[in-house]
Amino acid sequence: MRNYELMTVFPVEEDLYKPGIDALHSILADFGVQIKSEEPFGDRDLAYEIKKKTKGRYVLFNIEADPAKMIELDKRFKLITQMLTYLFVRLED
């Protein structure tokens, strides 16, 4: 298991944010990912338009995951239509 930071950006509209964050938690649980912390960063302007949105709700996760499952996890994240974008960063052990 390795430690990762996961930065996610969701639409600011509550009816899009809530299902998106629920889908994210469900996928992480399906893959046996342990969420060490979840820190909302709030709503911010995007540097450029993503999926016709100019504002996003940022949430930072510190997670522990199996590196062998990261490619499949990435593929599943792409199916979350409510999530604007995301980034995984592996942390030093």
From Swiss-Prot:
This is Small ribosomal subunit protein bS6. Keywords: Ribonucleoprotein, Ribosomal protein, RNA-binding, rRNA-binding. One of its GO terms (molecular function) is structural constituent of ribosome. The keyword Ribonucleoprotein applies. Binds together with bS18 to 16S ribosomal RNA. GO terms for biological process: translation. It comes from Treponema denticola (strain ATCC 35405 / DSM 14222 / CIP 103919 / JCM 8153 / KCTC 15104). InterPro entries: Ribosomal_bS6, Ribosomal_bS6_CS, Ribosomal_bS6_sf, Ribosomal_S6_plastid/chlpt, Transl_elong_EF1B/ribsomal_bS6. It comes from the Bacteria. It holds the Pfam family Ribosomal_S6. Belongs to the bacterial ribosomal protein bS6 family. GO terms for cellular component: ribonucleoprotein complex; ribosome.
